Amino acid sequence: MSLLEVHGLKKVYTSRFGGQSVQALSNVNFSVEQGEYVAIMGESGSGKTTLLNILAALDRPTEGEVLLEGRSMSEIRESELAAYRRENLGFVFQDFNLLDTFSIRDNIFLPLVLSGKRYEQMNEKLAPIARKLGIEDILSKYPYEVSGGQKQRAAVARALITQPKIVLADEPTGALDSRASDDLLSLFDEINRTGQTILMVTHSVKAASHAFREIGRAHV
């Protein structure tokens, strides 16, 4: 059984005004195995973000099914979705999605706080991750006090701290300069070597080249 299975996904949006329909996804099929590093390639407007939103259970498909460890996401009640995402999925976004009023440490802690973890437990989980990502010295700083590369490392730490089954990365190098992008991609390589499954959405050929395999326009 694959870790993630996608069967016949279709997504159609209908405009509120005029009832015009736009098809964002059509018959998308693929699977991701435990420990794989997979890139979904495509230009802007090709449906990559729509697909990622469905995989993250932030949106529902018009047709088709997504299964994580054999469980269909369509079976999960709306009231359970937030907890399901926290427990199973890690997210890395292009624009970091860090809260400026929270320190780097507290930003990383946020999914654990929402899960009701104690402060001591959170610190125990953070220590090895911060060491691996090289962010021990910036934990007490705020997002506006650190570089873009450091912000993205903090975002990666937040994604990893819940020990997710899969990390979903949406254009993770999009807001970074060339050097910071290279550093982040090397970091993803290292994280993947520990067994972490990564699914990355990108339009960058260079970023996609770090993955085991690519899923391109023929599928998305």
Q: Where on the chain are the PLM-derived regions?
A:
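ABC family nucleotide-binding domain
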Residues: 3-4, 9-214
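Conserved small/polar residues in nucleotide/adenosyl-binding loops
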Residues: 218-220
